């Protein structure tokens, strides 16, 4: 990593295992991997790291609670814990070494297929805008910002991160009629959907949550 990051001023760190898995399986990619990125940034005098964090760093809060960037961590599993760790790692490297960091707490960056995603959706266009703002903003210091579109039902607030200049354009409400026309029995039966972390919050530690997620990896109709 040190060789790959020579003579760069900014690193976008989006690499990770993106599921709930046993801790030892998570350790290399999500914990040590993040340390390696920031240590390489320090050794190579890199000015900033843009990090793909996750809603799962605060996934155990009830969905009725509005979350802000300054909301304390409440991880919903080992995956969420790895995001908490890296946000704290980023804070330490900023305080000790002056490396700026923008931690993007990405919510649901996939097609809207559930009632929960009406609150948490981040469109691809808004994701691109968010990353570009994290890159182009002149001075970020250490910042946390939620990756979420301008959804009518959202209770993720970026009131503490206005300096990033992220102004999402899309709104999941355009999918609401279709979602409520579907059978929601299975979704509503999952206690995790009462929490910001969704199925990750109700899945046992170390057990995959992706099987419970109604994610459709298709751009048809977009």
Regions found by a protein language model. Give the residues of each.
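A recurrent short beta-strand within the Rossmann-like NAD(P)-dependent oxidoreductase core
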Residues: 116, 140-149, 157-159
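Alpha-helical substrate-binding/gating segment
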Residues: 95, 105-111, 121-143, 150
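SDR active-site strand-loop-helix element
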Residues: 11-15, 49-55, 104-106
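NAD(P)H-binding glycine-rich loop region in Rossmannoid oxidoreductase-like domains
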Residues: 1-29
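Catalytic helix-loop patch of NAD(P)-dependent Rossmann-fold dehydrogenases
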Residues: 28, 62-101
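Conserved C-terminal active-site "lid" loop/helix of NAD(P)H-dependent oxidoreductases
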Residues: 150-167, 179-217
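Glycine-rich NAD(P)-binding loop of the Rossmann-fold in SDR/ketoreductase-type enzymes
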Residues: 10, 25-36, 44, 73, ...
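Conserved Rossmann-fold NAD(P)-dependent oxidoreductase catalytic core, especially the SDR/UDP-sugar
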Residues: 36-76
């Amino acid at each position: 990593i040190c060789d790959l990051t020579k003579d760069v001023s900014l690193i976008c760190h989006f690499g990770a295992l993106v599921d709930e898995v046993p801790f030892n399986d998570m350790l290399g990619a999500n914990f040590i991997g993040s340390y390696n990125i920031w240590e390489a940034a320090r050794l190579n005098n890199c000015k900033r790291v843009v990090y793909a964090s996750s809603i799962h760093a605060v996934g155990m809060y009830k969905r009725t609670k509005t979350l802000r960037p300054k909301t304390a961590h409440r991880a919903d599993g080992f995956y969420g814990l790895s995001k908490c760790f890296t946000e704290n790692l980023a804070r330490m490297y900023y305080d000790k070494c002056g490396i700026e960091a923008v931690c993007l707490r990405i919510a649901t960056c996939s097609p809207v297929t559930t009632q929960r995603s009406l609150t948490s959706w981040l469109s691809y266009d808004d994701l691109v805008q968010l990353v570009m703002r994290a890159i182009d903003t002149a001075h970020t210091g250490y910042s946390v910002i939620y990756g979420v579109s301008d959804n009518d039902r959202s209770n993720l607030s970026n009131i503490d991160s206005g300096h990033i200049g992220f102004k999402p354009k899309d709104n999941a409400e355009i999918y609401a009629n279709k979602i409520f026309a579907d059978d929601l029995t299975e979704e509503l039966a999952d206690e995790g959907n009462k929490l910001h972390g969704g199925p990750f919050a109700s899945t046992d530690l170390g057990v995959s949550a992706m099987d419970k997620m109604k994610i459709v990896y298709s751009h048809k109709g977009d």
